Amino acid sequence: MIELGLHTDNWRPLSMSFEASCAKIAAVGIKHLEFAAIHGQNFIQALGYDPGISLQANPLALRRYLDKKGLKVSQIDGSYPMMGPNGSAFGVQYVTQTIRFAAELGCPMVDTVDGAFETPGM
């Protein structure tokens, strides 16, 4: 059975927090969500204006929070331009940490991107 899920980034233009995004998703009866992983800390997210989650957050506490709302994480957005000039320096570590976080959270998938531009010869 195919089930619909939403990315918390849908509420980014409204400067909503992760918690506010989860409340909106749960309110319409959707059970699955995706969120962006933040590698480190983000000032805007700490103020409650970004619906992403820091990879330094406690995944078990996050899982308990989502369980109470009846939500499951279907995928974590660990997007970094892997084929860009900093892909090997930063992207690999970022995605590796996102995979670890997903495993601790019980999330089955992580996504990333190759980059914004076509790499010559690829």
Where are these regions (language model features)?
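N-terminal pre-domain/capping segments
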Residues: 1-109
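Active-site groove signature of glycoside hydrolases
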Residues: 102-122
